[in-house]
C-alpha cells in the first residue's frame, strides 16, 4: 500500500510502502461456490487501497483502526485482524502493528 504516514512531517512528505495483512472472519460461509455468497477480497482490497490513499496520518495504529472500522462496516465479517508493516527504520526489516476487532465492539 502507498500512503503518507509518520510522526515527523518529513516522513509524511512522500508516500511510502506499507505491507498489509488482513484476516477476516466471514459471517456466513457460502453454500455454493459463488463469489456473491461471501466476501469479495478484490473489493476489500480496492476499498482499503482507496482508504489508505486518502490524506496523511501520523500513526500506523490510526490507519489500522480505520481499516478495521471500514471493513467491519462495509462487509459481512464478524471480526478482522489487521497487521501493517512499515519499512522505515534502517536497522530493522520492518516495524508494525497488529489489531483485532470484532463486530459490535466500540472502535
Give residue spans per PLM region.
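N-terminal, polar/charged subdomain of small-to-medium soluble alpha/beta proteins
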Residues: 1-107
Amino acid at each position: 500500500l502507498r500512503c503518507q504516514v509518520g510522526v515527523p512531517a518529513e516522513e509524511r512528505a512522500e508516500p511510502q510502502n506499507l505491507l498489509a495483512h488482513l484476516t477476516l472472519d466471514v459471517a456466513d460461509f457460502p453454500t455454493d461456490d459463488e463469489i456473491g455468497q461471501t466476501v469479495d477480497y478484490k473489493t476489500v482490497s480496492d476499498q482499503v487501497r482507496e482508504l489508505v490513499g486518502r490524506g496523511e496520518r501520523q500513526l500506523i495504529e490510526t490507519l489500522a483502526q480505520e481499516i478495521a472500522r471500514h471493513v467491519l462496516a462495509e462487509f459481512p465479517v464478524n471480526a478482522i485482524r489487521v497487521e501493517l508493516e512499515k519499512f522505515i527504520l534502517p536497522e530493522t526489516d520492518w516495524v508494525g502493528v497488529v489489531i483485532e476487532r470484532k463486530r459490535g465492539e466500540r472502535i
